Regions:
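Conserved nucleotidyltransferase catalytic core and NTase-mimicking acidic/glycine-rich helix/loop elements
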Residues: 129-287, 291-294, 301-313
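Short, structured coil/loop segments at alpha-helix boundaries
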Residues: 9-13, 23-26, 94-95, 111-119, ...
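Short charge-dense sequence patches
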Residues: 1-5, 52, 86-99, 112-124, ...
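Generic hydrophobic secondary-structure signal
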Residues: 16-19, 23, 29-34, 49-54, ...
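Conserved NTP/Mg2+-binding pocket subregion across the NTase superfamily
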Residues: 2-8, 69-157
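Metal-dependent nucleotidyltransferase catalytic core
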Residues: 2-30, 35-47, 52-104
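Charged, low-complexity, helix/coiled-coil-prone segments
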Residues: 34-45, 77-90, 103-116, 164, ...
């Protein structure tokens, strides 16, 4: 770490210490958790401080955000009653953004030992949480992958194809990091590049640092296609299990509603289209009506699992 960086960190730390000393005197604040770069990463002069403040449970106190001054530093504080914090910790999907932000944070002080215990529990990542986050990352990767193929094949625009590949690369990086059992934060691409250099050099750093040609862009698309295809049974485990247990066709509306309600995951119909293209499920149709008062039935896209139950992840 350079001298200037050390000086900046020292300046931020001193400003934070002064603010926390003030906050400790507030009887309505039970704990302070330092989040963001200052808690676990490098900072620069333009950095700010992210601070979670856990308050007492009181009907007059609601979760809120407040921008504070600490010396020359800007502090983004989010206040959360203890009950809401507990609900967030116990109910948050592990490796979601909220979970990662708090799990990588540092408890500065607490007047309530149960808050310390809740913070400690953040470091566990369950199997089900991993499956949900892998599914979410994979469904987010598919649309930009399709866009990249479209702009490459139909338009021949290498720059715009590369842009969509880079969009997809961020979701692929989440897959790589989560699959390795690590916490995925906003800086997943550098993490993934260390974990899997051959793939992420091709779909990320090479696209940024070398001249784009049809062969290099094609290699990036091929690398993405192979990456997803090799991992499809793992990434879409929850979808395969759902359709396998249903033992009959489910419409896209039913599928989307079920995954949104149970896991808060969108775009699962797109995932089903991909799985159908991969031969892992079958594309069928079910009768549907366009409105509640329609007198004509149309065919809605649906999917069915055909084959032995999926292997365990």
């Amino acid at each position: 770490m350079s001298t200037s960086t050390e000086q900046i960190r020292q300046k931020f730390t001193e400003a934070l210490d002064d603010l926390v000393a003030q906050v400790k005197k507030d009887r309505s604040i039970l704990a302070a958790i330092l989040c963001g770069s200052l808690s676990h990463d490098a900072v620069c002069a333009k950095s700010d401080i992210d601070l979670a403040l856990i308050t007492v449970d009181d009907k007059k106190i609601e979760s809120s955000h407040l921008s504070l001054c600490a010396g020359d530093a800007n502090v983004h504080a989010f206040l959360m009653p203890r009950a809401a914090f507990r609900k967030t910790v116990e109910g948050s999907v592990r490796n979601s953004f909220a979970h990662s932000l708090l799990a990588k944070g540092r408890l500065l002080y607490t007047h309530d030992e149960t808050i310390a215990q809740l913070c400690e529990s953040l470091h566990g990542i369950g199997r089900r949480d991993t499956q949900v986050q892998l599914l979410a990352a994979a469904t987010q990767a598919l649309p930009p992958v399709y866009k990249a193929h479209k702009w490459f094949v139909a338009r021949g625009d290498l720059d715009y194809t590369a842009l969509w590949i880079l969009h997809a690369a961020n979701s692929l990086a989440r897959i790589e990091v989560i699959g390795a059992g690590l916490l995925a934060d906003r800086e997943v691409l550098p993490q993934a590049l260390k974990l899997n250099p051959p793939v992420f050099k091709t779909v990320y750093s090479d696209l940024l640092n070398t001249k784009k040609t049809r062969p290099t862009v094609q290699r990036a698309l091929d690398a993405i296609d192979a990456y997803l295809a090799q991992r499809a049974p793992m990434l879409f485990r929850l979808v395969l299990d759902y359709l396998s247990e249903a033992a009959e066709a489910r419409s896209c509306t039913e599928i989307e509603d079920w995954f949104k309600r149970h896991f808060d995951v969108d775009c699962v119909a797109t995932a089903c289209e991909y799985l159908s293209d991969q031969g892992l499920i079958a594309r069928v149709s079910l009768p549907a009506r366009l409105t509640k008062v329609s007198n004509v039935a149309v065919e809605e896209l649906a999917f069915v699992y055909q084959g032995a139950p999926p292997d365990e992840f």
